[in-house]
Amino acid sequence: LDRATQLALVAAHEAMTEAGISGKPEDAHRFGVYAGVGFGGAQTVDSLYERFYTLLHDTSQPGRNPTVMHPLSVPRMMANAPAALVSMRYGLNGPSNTYSVACASSAVALGEVFRAIRDGYLDAAVVLGTEAMLTPGALMAWNALRVMARPNVTDPARSCRPFSKDRNGFVLGEGAAAIVLESEARARARSRQALSELCGYGCS
């Protein structure tokens, strides 16, 4: 699995555990997975290019074919892989949707779940956001945009200062987060204490 998917599975596990859900829910057909993913399988893509160009120029291994890749390369790199794997892990048969809206991807995923529950299409969903782009190719691509922060040599932790007046760019990171969003009726039926309430959503 690509690292972005691995991170998503861990986050989803924590969210499901927090929500008191283990195994396949009885209402799995009304339980979806909505993911926000900006790119997806960056690690997989980078490793494919590395293998291809290494074997293409490696004269010490004349019998190795640089075009022969792992048969699951495409499913690993697809942006919908995290949502698909979480759906399969928990046997969730509701919609498995992925939104790619740059930095707003997981926020849009959350809002669309809100609408689906409000309008009666779903009762619950795992909402997740994941990204893992700490690869040579991704770092060079972001650096080419001239948006990366210049490193603070004396205190590297201060390189990322998005709200400072002397900020000079951002620091690329990786991670995943997930929550379980469900209708109030479903939460009450399970005698679960809600951690928060989502009251609205807009997107333009």
Over which residues does each language-model region extend?
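Condensing-enzyme catalytic core mediating Claisen C-C bond formation in acyl metabolism
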Residues: 153-204
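Conserved beta-ketoacyl condensing-enzyme motif
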Residues: 1-101, 130-139
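Short, high-confidence coil segments that cap the C-terminus of an alpha-helix
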Residues: 121-125
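Short conserved active-site loop signatures built around small residues
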Residues: 106
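Active-site-adjacent elements of ketosynthase-type condensing enzymes
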Residues: 42-50, 132-160, 178, 202-204
